[in-house]
Amino acid sequence: MTEAFARAKINLTLHVTGQRPDGYHLLDSLVVFADVGDRVRAEPAEALSLAITGPQAANLPVADDNLVLRAARTLGGQGARLTLEKHLPVASGIGGGSADAAAALVALARLWQVPLPEPAAVLKLGADVPVCLEGRAVRMAGVGEILTPLAAPLPEGWLVLANPGVSVPTPPVFKALARRDNPPMPDDLPGWPTVEALAAFLATQRNDLEPPAIALAPEIARTRAALAAQRGCLLARMSGSGATCFGLFAAEEAARAAAEAIGAEHPGWWVAPARMVG
């Protein structure tokens, strides 16, 4: 048996800078990962199959077009018994399905002893699959296929992720965008020696999908406000197309205390503290 961890993908920034003739949107995004996520296990078998377990399994029925199965078919036609242990909320802006697909590729490449595909080769599975396969902090551009490593390592920091239990499909959020030709991030990203410096930079940047997502799901604004109100929160923002928001913290103790406080006040929300992975 082989196993791979599917970390949550976090868009610290997400600038929508254009739209191609085929409809795909051009992005400029600073992407990191949180040390919380799903797990994909692969065991030898004659046929390809998938079982879904875990606390979020009920929200993701097994279907033939599941990204884990699609990723497996991309890698080859061999058999395997796949198990997806689902912890991340579905359709929540933190790349759960894309991270699962990337983890399936990693687990199956080990099981079948075949090379991993290049990140750009898996773009057809979804715009976030290449960056999830990369698995480290990068600047993501194009439609998700241009991945540029950061010049300097990110400072150590913590995230609190919060989702109000609302599923936000991505297409309506993009459709509701007021503009699709927004300015990108600076050409040269500065180094960030501290989490405070990173937060100060992020405050000058944006998630262009946040306003249309809030218009579709006002709970997102309340989630962001709940994070921002916590002691030690340096910045609160929506990730991806929502509805998950993140709070950036310098210290583990403050992040865990914030997650506990939000969870107590909003018992129906999904809340998780996690180390930021660069």
Swiss-Prot record:
Gene3D superfamilies xref list: 3.30.230.10, GHMP kinase, C-terminal domain
Annotated keywords: ATP-binding, Isoprene biosynthesis, Kinase, Nucleotide-binding, Transferase
EC number(s) per entry: 2.7.1.148
Protein name: 4-diphosphocytidyl-2-C-methyl-D-erythritol kinase
Keyword Transferase attached: yes
Pathway of action: Isoprenoid biosynthesis; isopentenyl diphosphate biosynthesis via DXP pathway; isopentenyl diphosphate from 1-deoxy-D-xylulose 5-phosphate: step 3/6
Family: Belongs to the GHMP kinase family. IspE subfamily.
Lineage of source species: Bacteria, Pseudomonadati, Pseudomonadota, Alphaproteobacteria, Rhodobacterales
GO molecular function, one term: 4-(cytidine 5'-diphospho)-2-C-methyl-D-erythritol kinase activity
Binding site for ATP: P89, V90, A91, S92, G93, I94, G95, G96, G97, S98, A99
Active-site residues per Swiss-Prot or TrEMBL entry: K9, D128
GO BP: isopentenyl diphosphate biosynthetic process, methylerythritol 4-phosphate pathway; terpenoid biosynthetic process
Keyword Transcription regulation (UniProt): no
